[in-house]
């Protein structure tokens, strides 16, 4: 991915933030959500600006696109939570914690890849 594509995506997020209207139509909520979108974009783009691997850049851009689409569809800028119980994924016999951690990482949706594991 080229620098121009990344900057174009960043500008798109900022344009969405500028024209965002909260689902509740309350001006305070709209301002809060606009600030969240802008701050989240700034934080994640700056956090990832040192990435040079094309595959990693592509994954970050896919995550951004997914979050944009989900946010626009549901009119909610916040990432959707995932509900996976700590040891809720099935494993084969003999494999315990490492397998669970790997399965949890694989089960994480693309739009939450940048979120810390809680």
Curated annotation (Swiss-Prot):
Residues covered by region (Disordered): 91-118
Biased composition (Basic residues): 93-107
Family as reported in the entry's similarity comment: Belongs to the complex I LYR family.
PANTHER family, alphabetized: LYR MOTIF-CONTAINING PROTEIN 1 (PTHR14273:SF0)
Protein name: LYR motif containing protein 1
Species this chain originates from: Danio rerio (Zebrafish)
């Amino acid at each position: 991915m080229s620098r121009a594509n990344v900057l174009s995506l960043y500008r798109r997020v900022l344009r969405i933030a500028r024209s965002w209207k909260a689902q509740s139509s309350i001006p305070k909520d709209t301002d809060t959500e606009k600030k969240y979108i802008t701050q989240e974009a700034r934080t994640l783009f700056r956090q990832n600006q040192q990435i040079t691997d094309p595959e990693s850049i592509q994954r970050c851009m896919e995550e951004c696109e997914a979050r944009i689409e989900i946010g626009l569809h549901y009119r909610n800028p916040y990432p959707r939570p995932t509900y996976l119980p700590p040891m809720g994924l099935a494993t084969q016999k003999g494999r315990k914690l490492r397998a669970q951690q790997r399965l949890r990482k694989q089960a994480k949706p693309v739009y939450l890849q940048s979120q810390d594991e809680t």
